[in-house]
């Protein structure tokens, strides 16, 4: 049986470029445990240029092969690609559209599902349409006096708000606001990251995460895990990834009533199926002191760094990551 030529594409053009390289390390290590795959790791830089781990400049062609700038090297045919890219152009759905165009099978959610989840406004509209509770919000499409006034009114009404760039990941362009004097400046900063901004009511709640993935034809939702930050903080980019982070994670959240845990998992599966996600996702919830469940966001290519929850929750659920990848990839290629 011939090996599968698997392109592990990582990097990308977002603020999460370096994080995706860490996630790619985990994928590379997991894939190396199987004898089925020839893996070529290629980094997509912030300017759209491709380079192998060995430093060879290259490109992915419409003929589904890696072509090297050094023409003495033979092109490398690609059977399958894992776009391990957090943020643009991976989780935004852009690169999946290209894969679809050249008919290259790939791991993860398809283009439309990725785009719908990455845009926080679109995602919340989907959550509501599916009947899944989520945080109160308003959205803004330009930075002007009216936007400032609407945000001031939201702050007065809700007491505390989050101002978020609508199309960024990992808490990039996300600001907690309690002081009305900071509204204008924060809005300006948020619009610097995206053309649309969402303003959400601050929810005092536990932050729970569920790994949701396809396994042998079934959609699996793990028990909720939990992110625990210092009091009066939220899970910022630095809290997620900095070595000095004081946040901690529990692979299985403690003291969550069984019926609440099951409802969270049911909502997670409903969101996965309803938004037509594929292969994997991490779905994040708030759980208030009154046991109110609110869907926060969906990550269509969750991190797989040493501190990331998705691989830990999958393993805790009894599934091996290498076996999981092999099942998905082989099943997809067999269906071609």
From Swiss-Prot:
This enzyme's EC code(s): 6.3.2.4
Highest rank taxon of the organism: Bacteria
Chain residues that bind Mg(2+) 1: 284, 297
Every ATP-grasp domain range: 124-330
Pfam families: Dala_Dala_lig_C, Dala_Dala_lig_N
Function: Cell wall formation.
Record's protein name: D-alanine--D-alanine ligase
Lineage: Bacteria, Pseudomonadati, Pseudomonadota, Gammaproteobacteria, Alteromonadales
């Amino acid at each position: 049986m011939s090996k599968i030529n698997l392109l592990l594409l990582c990097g990308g053009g977002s603020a999460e470029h370096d994080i995706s390289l860490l996630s790619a390390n985990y994928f590379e290590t997991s894939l190396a445990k199987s004898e089925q795959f020839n893996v070529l790791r290629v980094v997509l830089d912030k300017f759209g240029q491709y380079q192998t781990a060995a430093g060879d400049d290259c490109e992915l062609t419409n003929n589904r092969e890696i072509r090297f700038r050094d023409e003495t090297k033979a092109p490398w045919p690609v059977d399958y690609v894992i776009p391990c890219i957090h943020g643009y152009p991976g989780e935004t759905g852009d690169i999946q559209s290209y894969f679809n165009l050249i008919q290259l099978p790939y791991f993860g959610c398809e283009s439309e599902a990725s785009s719908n989840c990455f845009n926080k406004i679109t995602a919340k509209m989907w959550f509501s349409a599916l009947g899944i509770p989520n945080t109160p919000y308003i959205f803004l499409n330009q930075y002007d006096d009216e936007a400032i006034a609407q945000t001031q009114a939201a702050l007065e009404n809700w007491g505390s708000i989050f101002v978020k760039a609508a199309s960024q990941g990992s808490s990039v362009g996300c600001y907690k606001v309690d002081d009305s004097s900071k509204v204008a400046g924060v809005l300006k900063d948020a619009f610097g990251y995206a053309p649309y901004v969402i303003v959400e009511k601050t929810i005092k709640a536990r932050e729970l995460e569920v790994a949701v993935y396809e396994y042998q034809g079934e959609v699996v939702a793990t028990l909720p895990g939990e992110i625990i930050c210092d009091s009066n903080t939220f899970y910022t980019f630095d809290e997620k990834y900095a070595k000095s982070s004081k946040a901690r994670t529990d692979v299985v959240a403690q003291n969550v009533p069984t019926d609440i845990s099951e409802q969270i998992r049911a909502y997670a599966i409903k969101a996965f199926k309803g938004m037509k996600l594929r292969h994997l996702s991490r779905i994040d919830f708030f759980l208030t002191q009154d046991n109110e469940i609110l869907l926060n966001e969906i990550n269509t290519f969750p991190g797989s760094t040493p501190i990331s929850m998705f691989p830990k929750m999958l393993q805790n659920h009894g599934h091996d990551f290498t076996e999981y990848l092999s099942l998905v990839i082989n099943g997809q290629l067999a269906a071609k």
